Amino acid sequence: MASYTIVYFPVQGRCEAMRMLLADQDQSWKEEVVAMQSWLQGPLKASCLYGQLPKFQDGDLTLYQSNAILRHLGRTLGLYGKDQREAALVDMVNDGVEDLRCKYVSLIYTNYQAGKEDYVKALPQHLKPFETLLSQNKGGQAFIVGDQISFADYNLLDLLRIHQVLAPSCLDSFPLLSAYVARLNSRPKLKAFLASPEHVNRPINGNGKQ
């Protein structure tokens, strides 16, 4: 029986990184899908700590905030670096992912038509730090930190994949990031999840953009 439950809208959004993590780590979970009409009625929203989703259940532990959920899974499943130094770097990477994700969400939900061209033009400067980090770790042939996968890898992979949908050539000038995405995409359990109807048929965002 699954001990994890994801309560979220019928989109990838802020939950796909945790789904990728759980699938790749051979963990089972349940989905409680919240229709927007139901959400707008109010009671569920009022019951959520910050008035927002996702909500995550791990047994009797209830968590909100997607990055807190990822960090919890990182600690629980041994995906937080091998020592405190690596854990600090994993946190740094994840904060960098969050910075770019917030820019992406703002574009998608508030300024897509008018802002997409400028966003894509500025994208290389936001991707470059991740290419640099890869180059500093085993020549870019491993993970974003150390020699074992971390929760930040799943979050970064999700971020890069959705940007490849937004701008298909965005990684062309970043050979290490391109190889990194291909390498993680090919992990057997993750590859199976990414090919599954659950992933393929779930839109990235909730407003029809991607």
Swiss-Prot record:
Describe the location of the GST N-terminal domain by residue ranges.
Answer: 2-81
Q: Mainly localized where?
A: cytoplasm
Phosphothreonine occurs at T62
Q: Identify the EC number(s).
A: 2.5.1.18
What the entry lists under Pfam families is as follows: GST_C_3, GST_N
Provide the catalytic activity annotation: RX + glutathione = an S-substituted glutathione + a halide anion + H(+); prostaglandin J2 + glutathione = prostaglandin J2-S-(R)-glutathione; prostaglandin J2 + glutathione = prostaglandin J2-S-(S)-glutathione; prostaglandin A2 + glutathione = prostaglandin A2-S-(S)-glutathione
Q: How does it assemble?
A: Homodimer. Interacts with CDK5.
| Official protein name in the record | Glutathione S-transferase P
Please report the organism this UniProt entry assigns to the protein.
Answer: Capra hircus (Goat)
Name the gene. Answer: GSTP1
